[in-house]
Swiss-Prot record:
Role description: This protein is involved in the repair of mismatches in DNA. It is possible that it carries out the mismatch recognition step. This protein has a weak ATPase activity.
Gene3D superfamilies hit by this protein: 1.10.1420.10, 6.10.140.430, DNA repair protein MutS, domain I (3.40.1170.10), MutS, connector domain (3.30.420.110), P-loop containing nucleotide triphosphate hydrolases (3.40.50.300)
Keyword DNA-binding attributed: yes
GO CC annotations, alphabetized: cytosol
BP-aspect Gene Ontology terms: mismatch repair
Protein's name in the database: DNA mismatch repair protein MutS
Keywords: ATP-binding, DNA damage, DNA repair, DNA-binding, Nucleotide-binding
InterPro entries: DNA_mismatch_repair_MutS, DNA_mismatch_repair_MutS-lik_N, DNA_mismatch_repair_MutS/MSH, DNA_mismatch_repair_MutS_C, DNA_mismatch_repair_MutS_clamp, DNA_mismatch_repair_MutS_core, DNA_mismatch_repair_MutS_N, DNA_mismatch_repair_MutS_sf
Positions contributing to ATP binding: 614-621
Family matches, as Pfam families: MutS_I (PF01624), MutS_II (PF05188), MutS_III (PF05192), MutS_IV (PF05190), MutS_V (PF00488)
GO molecular function (one): ATP-dependent DNA damage sensor activity
Organism: Escherichia coli O7:K1 (strain IAI39 / ExPEC)
PROSITE patterns, A to Z: DNA_MISMATCH_REPAIR_2
């Protein structure tokens, strides 16, 4: 029989627990018991495994021992962080009644629910990384997707048209928690993600969503936000907002608007492209040697998060980009002065979110005060910068002198962690609080005077006055003198070597002091809450200030990076094309122990595809990736690693660079490669930048060559995309002779005997050879194997190309031949009976077959 089924047999306390647990059946319940949060039954068993804490038993209820695990209340944030990182959610149940006046169990209620996507506590968040709650919806027309960063109030929605676009959005946003409808069809799209939450269908209803959003924003409709005609996105947004309200158990005043993200506003990059370019995460899953690791020297966490958003959403509006470029140029002479001051601002964005949720701690308000104290100096420095965008940021960040003065008067210089610890409100801020504190703090002087007086009166030199939390104030006399205690001394506690007493005067003073301490703490909590009421009316202006400070941090950082790393300002042109003089890979040049070899690039409508040949390890992939990264950097407004760059409009960046088996989906390397290739061929346009590396590996030589040829042909002739096409199929170097707009380039290398020197220099024309055996020798392949390979190579080169292909590929089954149409000549031969032909008919058939070939 379960605990719920046997409800009436439980103790009153366990009945209270079971009622609360029934309201939150799928998540852990932290049930406050004095100085501990305790978990019972299955929750206790799960928590003991997840947190590696002891599983014990707490007496019995309904005749059965109760499995129990517990954690100290003062260490709860550490344990919550561990659970949230594992995708768990936790309901926090606090005592809200007074134990002294309660009959039966103290009243308790769930005051907040901590989930991976709705955390705002500083201890639970990665400070330089967005923490998103997301919701996904699907109908016959496509997907709806919404994200909310509850730690900043940033609310976005979009309507991805297909599965590939939706997958790219999931990878870009990487939500900590994802809500989906109970009938969601594309489960393979989200399976394996952390923080999945299945929600009932009614939470995604469009009418409910509109009502929820209008209520949140205080509007009659959503036209002003530009989302009125995005029903799928609104369905996701409505579910997401309801979930956020349910978990926070309070209003969300910092969520003031919602923004529609449209494909045409930014350069689109699919999941494979983001992965291959290693923008914020390398191929091994870490953050080292990524584009962000080179560009991100921001001095505030909110600036770092903004920069990463820019990197994942390059904008196409050249007006925005030119404004950023101009600002970066104007700030280059001021970075050394601005960055130390900006560093002192801290993470104002997340502090404001905690203020809005009324969970800001005393040190949050102290940090907010410190941020306000930097604003006058920042504004004074920016006044000297000759840039309209900088002056606009200066105005937007404001000064908040009144709020700074309020916090300077209200909060002590170094407050404790929690308001319940007391001593947060500064002396002089409130007269009544000062009076209660004086009464409580005067206890030390009183006790010293009492001790001197009683020693003199009794003549007992071992007499002393003290206090402990259990027994309160006492007079202590050694065991040897205890028989001399006056008659008015009432025994309170017996120790091994002493007796402790109380007298009416001391008891009366104890009551007075404890009352004053309690009243002081209660008043302090009230004054602290009133500070929220004084600050919250300024929330919108404060959020604008935080946004301006974060943007300033990003732009100052990019100015510093441009100067330090010798970057140049790219020029935007109207027609498709990319012209780079002495371009460099932004990441590789930082990790090399030798100078990076800069290379040029020229793509235009008249030269829209480069066939790139050269040895493995020669630098083909680096050359291709650096082109994409330079384009990406240009389209966030950054300066770029080159001597000169001219770049035209780009709508998408595609990369088909390297692949690995997708074992989880049952897809081979070749299948992954072909899926990514298909996506490119279906979605690329003449404004797209396409990187194709070694297409056609993983199948027979002829199949691979045929596929690579056809893909290159399609990209150059039909799609007309700007394409870098690296290959080891030397037959493809004939394409420039057969098609307009195609050119050969190669990565140079020098071979001397058994050694090879990679020049990493891009030259016009095709490579003379692939240097495969030299690279194999460099990799440590045994010499006898290299020797045998050279012998076999000479054999293959001495026979006809067809024979060579037969020897190499004879045992391989051609994928393309399976569905090839039979030629007319073959069909004619299959229907021919040679035994029935006359010599003349046989001759006629020879001529007929020749005409069919």
């Amino acid at each position: 029989m379960s605990a719920i089924e046997n409800f009436d047999a439980h103790t009153p306390m366990m009945q209270q627990y079971l009622k609360l647990k029934a309201q939150h059946p799928e998540i852990l319940l932290f049930y406050r018991m004095g100085d501990f949060y305790e978990l019972f039954y299955d929750d206790a068993k799960r928590a003991s495994q997840l947190l590696d804490i002891s599983l014990t038993k707490r007496g019995a209820s309904a005749g059965e021992p109760i499995p129990m695990a517990g954690i100290p209340y003062h260490a709860v944030e550490n344990y919550l962080a561990k659970l949230v990182n594992q995708g768990e959610s936790v309901a926090i149940c606090e005592q809200i009644g007074d134990p002294a006046t309660s009959k039966g169990p103290v009243e308790r209620k769930v005051v907040r629910i901590v989930t991976p996507g709705t955390i705002s506590d500083e201890a639970l968040l990665q400070e330089r990384q967005d923490n998103l709650l997301a919701a996904i919806w699907q109908d016959s027309k496509g997907f709806g997707y919404a994200t909310l960063d509850i730690s900043s109030g940033r609310f976005r929605l979009s309507e991805p048209a297909d599965r590939e676009t939706m997958a790219a959005e999931l990878q870009r946003t990487n939500p900590a928690e994802l809500l989906y409808a109970e009938d969601f069809a594309e489960m393979s799209l989200i399976e394996g993600r952390r923080g999945l939450r299945r929600r009932p269908l009614w939470e995604f209803e469009i009418d409910t969503a509109r009502q929820q959003l209008n209520l949140q924003f205080g509007t009659r409709d959503l036209v002003g936000f530009g989302v009125e005609n995005a029903p799928r996105g609104l369905c996701a947004a409505g579910c997401l907002l309801q979930y956020a309200k349910d978990t926070q158990r309070t209003t969300l005043p910092h969520i003031r608007s919602i923004t529609m993200e449209r494909e045409q506003d930014s350069i689109i990059m699919d999941a494979a492209t983001r992965r291959n370019l290693e923008i914020t995460q390398n191929l091994a899953g870490g953050a080292e040697n990524t584009l962000a690791s080179v560009l991100d020297c921001t001095v505030t966490p909110m600036g770092s998060r903004m920069l990463k958003r820019w990197l994942h959403m390059p904008v196409r509006d050249t007006r925005v980009l030119l404004e950023r470029q101009q600002t970066i140029g104007a700030l280059q002479d001021f970075t050394a002065e601005l960055q130390p001051v900006l560093r002192q601002v801290g993470d104002l964005e997340r502090i404001l979110a905690r203020l809005a949720l009324r969970t800001a701690r005393p040190r949050d308000l102290a940090r907010m005060r410190h941020a306000f104290q930097q604003l006058p100096e920042l504004r004074a420095l920016l006044e000297n910068v000759d840039s309209a965008p900088v002056q606009a940021l200066r105005e937007k960040m404001g000064e908040f002198a009144e709020l700074r003065d309020l916090l300077e008067r209200a909060i002590i210089d170094t407050p404790p962690v929690l308001v319940r610890d007391g001593g947060v409100i500064a002396p002089g801020y409130n007269e009544e609080l000062d009076e209660w504190r004086a009464l409580a703090d005067g206890a030390t002087d009183y006790l010293e005077r009492l001790e001197v007086r009683e020693r003199e009166r009794t003549g007992l030199d071992t007499l002393k006055v003290g206090f402990n939390a259990v027994h309160g104030y006492y007079i202590q006399i050694s065991r040897g003198q205890s028989h001399l205690a006056p008659i008015n001394y009432m025994r309170r506690q017996t120790l091994k070597n002493a007796e402790r007493y109380i007298i009416p005067e001391l008891k009366e003073y104890e009551d007075k002091v404890l009352t004053s301490k309690g009243k002081a703490l209660a008043l302090e909590k009230q004054l602290y809450e009133e500070l929220f009421d004084l600050l919250l009316p300024h929330l919108e202006a404060l959020q604008q200030s935080a946004s301006a400070l974060a943007e300033l941090d990003v732009l100052v950082n990019l100015a510093e990076r441009a100067y330090t790393l010798n970057y140049t300002c790219p020029t935007f042109i109207d027609k498709p094309g990319i012209r780079i003089t002495e371009g460099r890979h932004p990441v590789v040049e930082q990790v090399l122990n030798e100078p990076f070899i800069a290379n040029p690039l020229n793509l235009s409508p008249q030269r829209r595809m480069l066939i790139i040949t050269g040895p493995n390890m020669g630098g083909k992939s680096t050359y291709m990736r650096q082109t994409a990264l330079i384009a990406l950097m240009a389209y966030i407004g950054s300066y770029v690693p080159a001597q000169k760059v001219e770049i035209g409009p780009i709508d998408r960046i595609f990369t088909r660079v390297g692949a690995a088996d997708d074992l989880a989906s049952g897809r081979s390397t070749f299948m992954v490669e072909m899926t990514e290739t298909a996506n490119i061929l279906h979605n690329a346009t003449e404004y797209s930048l396409v990187l194709m590396d070694e297409i056609g590996r993983g199948t027979s030589t002829y199949d691979g060559l045929s596929l690579a040829w056809a893909c290159a042909e399609n990209l150059a002739n039909k799609i007309k995309a700007l394409t870098l096409f690296a290959t080891h199929y030397f037959e493809l170097t004939q394409l420039p002779e057969k098609m307009e707009g195609v050119a050969n380039v190669h990565l140079d290398a020098l071979e001397h005997g058994d050694t090879i020197a990679f020049m990493h220099s891009v030259q016009d024309g095709a490579a003379s050879k692939s240097y495969g055996l030299a690279v194999a020798a460099l990799a440590g392949v045994p010499k006898e194997v290299i020797k045998r390979a050279r012998q076999k190579l000479r054999e293959l080169e001495s026979i006809s190309p067809n024979a060579a292909a037969t020897q190499v590929d004879g045992t391989q089954m051609s994928l393309l031949s399976v569905q090839e149409e039979t030629s007319p000549a073959v069909e004619a031969l299959e229907n021919l009976d040679p035994d029935s032909l006359t010599p003349r008919q046989a001759l006629e058939w020879i001529y007929r077959l020749k005409s069919l070939v």
